[in-house]
Amino acid sequence: MTSLVYAAKGIRILGIDPGLRITGFGIVEKIGNRLVYIGSGCVVTGESGLPDRLKTILDGLNEIILQHKPEQVAVEQVFVNINPKSTLLLGQARGAAISAAVLHELSVYEYTALQVKQAVVGNGHARKEQVQEMVMRLLGLGERPRPDAADALACAICHAHGGTGLLTLSARNRSKRSKRL
């Protein structure tokens, strides 16, 4: 008699914490009610001009998507800063990050920093160190990830815990709309 063994199929989630200088990324896989750490890091843009920085973000995330093959993407939303110029620049970095996901026809989910912190720490006003500590514990990491990578992992964890996000850009819906045109 032959027994069949089925591998548990998880959902691979790429979390992104967009930034013009440093864009954090983190990949987790949700298998049942478990979260498995896949990888994390940062795309560093340097001091070049805005178009070059945006291209670095797009290219860096494109490479990460090709390498890790996520099925869904969770992105932290921009908070309105005191400085409107900074808010607009950060929005452009987010646009580059979302574009990388959309180019691969991935579903994109957005979460506020408050939602992410609430989901991961239990306190929407948690400090960065608290987020890093909880990410380390939840994923069984040996050390705290860099702040930007920790925020990206926290965003992925928030999504994995069932957050629906404020805005969903579904690849399926986009393809349906394009067929109607």
UniProtKB/Swiss-Prot annotation:
Similarity-based family: Belongs to the RuvC family.
List the catalysed reactions. Endonucleolytic cleavage at a junction such as a reciprocal single-stranded crossover between two homologous DNA duplexes (Holliday junction)
What is the predominant subcellular site recorded for this chain? cytoplasm
* Gene source species: Nitrosomonas europaea (strain ATCC 19718 / CIP 103999 / KCTC 2705 / NBRC 14298)
What superkingdom does the record give?
Answer: Bacteria
The UniProt record lists the EC number as: 3.1.21.10
> What does the entry list as the binding residues for Mg(2+) 1?
D17, D148
Name the top EC class: hydrolase
Keywords from the named record: Cytoplasm, DNA damage, DNA recombination, DNA repair, DNA-binding, Endonuclease, Hydrolase, Magnesium, Metal-binding, Nuclease
Q: What processes does the entry annotate via GO biological process terms?
A: DNA recombination; DNA repair
Query: Which NCBIfam families does the entry mention?
Result: ruvC (TIGR00228)
Q: What does this protein do?
A: The RuvA-RuvB-RuvC complex processes Holliday junction (HJ) DNA during genetic recombination and DNA repair. Endonuclease that resolves HJ intermediates. Cleaves cruciform DNA by making single-stranded nicks across the HJ at symmetrical positions within the homologous arms, yielding a 5'-phosphate and a 3'-hydroxyl group; requires a central core of homology in the junction. The consensus cleavage sequence is 5'-(A/T)TT(C/G)-3'. Cleavage occurs on the 3'-side of the TT dinucleotide at the point of strand exchange.
Q: Which InterPro entries match?
A: RNaseH-like_sf, RNaseH_sf, X-over_junc_endoDNase_Mg_BS, X-over_junc_endoDNase_RuvC
Q: Which GO terms describe its cellular component?
A: cytoplasm; Holliday junction resolvase complex
- Catalytic residues per the record? D17, E76, D148
Cofactor note (record)? Binds 2 Mg(2+) ion per subunit.
Location relative to the cell? Cytoplasm
Q: How does it assemble?
A: Homodimer which binds Holliday junction (HJ) DNA. The HJ becomes 2-fold symmetrical on binding to RuvC with unstacked arms; it has a different conformation from HJ DNA in complex with RuvA. In the full resolvosome a probable DNA-RuvA(4)-RuvB(12)-RuvC(2) complex forms which resolves the HJ.
User: What name does the UniProt record give this protein?
Assistant: Crossover junction endodeoxyribonuclease RuvC
Gene Ontology MF terms in the entry: crossover junction DNA endonuclease activity; DNA binding; magnesium ion binding
Q: Which cofactor(s) does the record list?
A: Mg(2+)
- One Pfam family, please name it: RuvC
